[in-house]
């Protein structure tokens, strides 16, 4: 895929870059695999704001994605590559030999007409899913399970890939896109290859309005608020923060570690992220 730029015909157009969408082969989603997606604007089940800067945006339908890849031994043909508004990656529509259709995250290099397989006996080929125990060391993988049978949770964003560095006892050792090295059970499944839509990192939103189309609301700095709204607020004119930076709720921020000290999974992390 390529990134499209525009002539600066207006201030809003000047820095905008968009995907060319040239890999997309089908514009309407598969009707049996979509469900309505309700907007929550960052509110939880009590109606309280738990995630800031969310709200508005274009209406979306949720595409049901097969993260488990548990349909073993049945070949699936790639019917289409589609756009998904709910993620940065593209999605691929698979038609299985028994008639079932499923969406998966589209890996880089996957084309319409390719035939994919899942299961321990699948070939080492882009788009095939198999347990880490059956994948050769050095292979790039994505959509990795943390718990066997739960479905892929790691490495699902556009252009990402993890590398299988080795196997030790019951665990595989992976290098994740963040730089973290961690152990994952060998029974956990992963999909071969790198996630597609590699150029996503080069896209510039370019104007505030386009962020609003995506459901992203403005981020107001605490230092420009009043003291009632933020610990950094107040002062005459343009004032410095005047203390160690804190969140709106008074917790230390900017460079402070937020990971729980005694988290059970810490023993599986060999090297923390950069």
UniProtKB/Swiss-Prot annotation:
It comes from the Bacteria. InterPro entries: NA-bd_OB-fold, Rib_uL2_dom2, Ribosomal_uL2, Ribosomal_uL2_bac/org-type, Ribosomal_uL2_C, Ribosomal_uL2_CS, Ribosomal_uL2_dom3, Ribosomal_uL2_RNA-bd_dom. GO terms for biological process: cytoplasmic translation. The keyword rRNA-binding applies. One of its GO terms (molecular function) is rRNA binding. Keywords: Ribonucleoprotein, Ribosomal protein, RNA-binding, rRNA-binding. Gene3D superfamilies: 2.30.30.30, Nucleic acid-binding proteins, Ribosomal protein L2, domain 3. Residues 257-274 have a biased composition (Basic residues). The keyword Cell membrane does not apply. Part of the 50S ribosomal subunit. Forms a bridge to the 30S subunit in the 70S ribosome. Belongs to the universal ribosomal protein uL2 family. One of the primary rRNA binding proteins. Required for association of the 30S and 50S subunits to form the 70S ribosome, for tRNA binding and peptide bond formation. It has been suggested to have peptidyltransferase activity; this is somewhat controversial. Makes several contacts with the 16S rRNA in the 70S ribosome. This is Large ribosomal subunit protein uL2. It comes from Carboxydothermus hydrogenoformans (strain ATCC BAA-161 / DSM 6008 / Z-2901). The gene is rplB.
